[in-house]
């Protein structure tokens, strides 16, 4: 992106840090620390005025102390090395209470947190750099949980739940846009969100939200009053509308092997007067992830070829999908033996052709749609329901909703 205009207020949009994330029992903290160090340098070098994090700061509601240390160290260093504000909303992985607990202390460090949506729409508006002379307004709408959107009732059907959730989301953004209009702001309004926009590309590492994806919304839901909508939840950087006004920044690192080909980035927004000019900054790869699909006959050769690929700053992690093999333990032992001493680490070995998981006969191959479903429990449950011929459609719908509510609580 070109040099910052003299009269611009520069906002950086990022999301889905997932601090404390594990991949096959391996910590991602080394990569996350490198990312946060890099991010801090970009804030200083690019003269960023505000960093906007659109949810999923942490990977769990109760993150490990080491993950909290990464977060608070970044807050402190950002405050020490720059004059930028830090603006954060909670995502579906975050605990709203945990994020907001130190809210008053963080405010003294120019850090503004909204874990739960404010009851009064006017209270969702953050004016930067100051309320007296704002250059941009941030409409802080965090992840909207079911209790924020509808009154749950037993026996509700999927179509009813979907309609109520989508209407609840629409209402939250319309109320916020109306509050911004009532405030008679002379500056652009940037809205935040942590949700699923219908048609956007997902990966295997996103957890179902709004009871199994029932709350996917159309891009047209967001009022035109918002000059830009900074989204989190989906890990692939992408725009969801033709104008590029509604965007996911994506996660800063690949959080699963399904994201290995994603080009990670942060978004830059130069607010000049009433206009918002967009740009992006590519994020370096701190550790390469690689999925090796091979056969028993080609295994040794393919592992040797992998060893020739230059690693990033941290050693490469590999997932091996092996076809033409019948025993996982035996396959795992062979892969471990052949990869010993190589400049990469094999995290996981999977069989590419195994019997169907549910209702399969001997020799039947796995349905391609089942690949990776262990990370998507609601889809596994849906697959199980399809095998139950004695259940009515109404019974299946009720069971599906009950299961997804259970998953949402975990």
Region spans (language model):
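Short beta-strand segments at enzyme active-site cores
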Residues: 49-55, 86-90, 188-192
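N-terminal active-site segment of His-dependent metallophosphoesterases
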Residues: 1-76, 83, 401, 405, ...
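A short helix->loop->beta-strand "cap" motif at the edges of active sites that frequently abuts
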Residues: 80-86, 187, 244
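Divalent metal-coordination and catalytic microenvironments
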Residues: 16, 36, 56, 71, ...
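His/Asp/Glu-rich metal-coordinating catalytic cores
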Residues: 63, 90-243
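Accessory, non-catalytic peripheral segments of nucleic-acid enzymes
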Residues: 5-6, 45, 271-410
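Binuclear metal-dependent phosphoesterase catalytic core
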Residues: 122-136, 141, 246-310
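Alpha-helical scaffolding segments of alpha/beta enzyme cores, especially the outer helices
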Residues: 38, 69-77, 101-104, 171, ...
């Amino acid at each position: 992106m070109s040099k910052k205009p003299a009269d611009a207020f520069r906002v950086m949009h990022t999301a889905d840090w997932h601090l404390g994330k594990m991949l096959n029992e391996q910590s991602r903290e080394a990569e996350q620390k490198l990312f946060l160090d890099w991010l801090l340098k970009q804030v200083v070098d690019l003269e960023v005025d505000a960093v906007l994090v659109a949810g999923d700061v942490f990977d769990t509601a109760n993150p490990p102390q080491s993950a909290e240390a990464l977060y608070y160290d970044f807050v402190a260093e950002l405050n020490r090395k720059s004059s930028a504000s830090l603006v954060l909303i909670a995502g579906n992985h975050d605990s709203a209470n945990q994020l907001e607990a130190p809210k008053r202390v963080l405010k003294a460090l120019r850090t503004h947190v909204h874990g739960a949506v404010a009851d009064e729409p006017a209270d969702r508006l953050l004016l930067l750099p100051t309320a007296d002379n704002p250059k941009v307004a941030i409409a802080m709408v965090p992840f909207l949980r079911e209790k924020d959107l509808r009154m749950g009732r037993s026996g509700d059907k999927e179509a009813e739940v979907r309609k109520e959730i989508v209407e609840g989301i629409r209402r939250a953004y319309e109320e916020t846009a109306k509050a911004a209009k009532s405030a008679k702001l002379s500056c652009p309004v940037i809205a935040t969100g942590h949700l699923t926009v219908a048609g956007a590309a997902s990966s295997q590492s996103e957890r179902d939200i709004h009871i199994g994806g029932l709350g996917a919304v159309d891009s047209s839901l967001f009022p035109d009053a918002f000059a830009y909508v900074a989204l989190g939840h989906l890990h692939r950087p992408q725009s969801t509308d033709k104008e590029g006004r509604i965007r996911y920044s994506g996660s800063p690192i690949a959080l699963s092997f399904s994201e290995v080909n994603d080009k990670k980035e942060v978004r830059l927004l130069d607010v000049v007067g009433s206009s918002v000019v967009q740009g992006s900054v590519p994020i370096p790869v701190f550790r390469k992830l690689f999925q090796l699909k091979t056969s028993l006959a080609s295994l040794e050769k393919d592992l040797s070829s992998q060893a020739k690929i230059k690693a990033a700053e941290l050693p490469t992690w590999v997932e091996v999908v092996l076809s033409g093999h019948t025993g996982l333990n035996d396959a795992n032992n062979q892969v471990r033996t052949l990869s010993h001493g190589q400049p990469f680490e094999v995290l996981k070995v999977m069989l590419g052709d195994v019997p169907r998981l549910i209702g399969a006969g001997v020799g039947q191959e796995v349905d391609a749609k089942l690949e990776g479903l262990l990370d998507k429990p609601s889809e596994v449950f849906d697959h199980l329901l399809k095998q139950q011929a004695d259940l009515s459609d109404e019974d299946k719908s009720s069971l599906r909703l009950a299961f997804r509510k259970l998953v949402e609580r975990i």
